[in-house]
Amino acid sequence: MNKSQQAGFTLIELVMVIVILGVLAAVALPKFVNVDDDAKQAAVNGVAGALSSASAINYASRKANSGKGNSVANCTDVANSLQGGLPTGYVITAAAITPADTTKTDCVVTANSKTANFTATSIN
């Protein structure tokens, strides 16, 4: 008498695997949902860093040769020094930089309800 053996998983084993995968998904999903907010903040921080760098480079260029660079009297003027301009959807809060020459001030850039500060240096 030959008894054939069947290979495979039992129903209980399959159900347990599905339950374990469900628990793992429930634990991991909230971590991936918040990544979107972190990415938006990182993008705004990157633009703020680029604006700070553009302001410093513009200041050095204009100080070395008054014919180069852009005059900066308020925070929004820094966008003119940024190569390619300010990206679409980003807004710089207008704030005067006083006194008018060689003063550093903190400015704010906003996009997607996220904000970041950057340093602007005024120069005539």
Model-inferred region functions:
Residues S53-N124:
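Periplasmic/extracellular, small/polar-rich flexible segments of pilin-like filament-forming proteins
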Residues V15-K31:
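Alpha-helical hydrophobic helix detector
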Residues M1-F9:
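N-terminal leader/signal peptides at the extreme start of proteins
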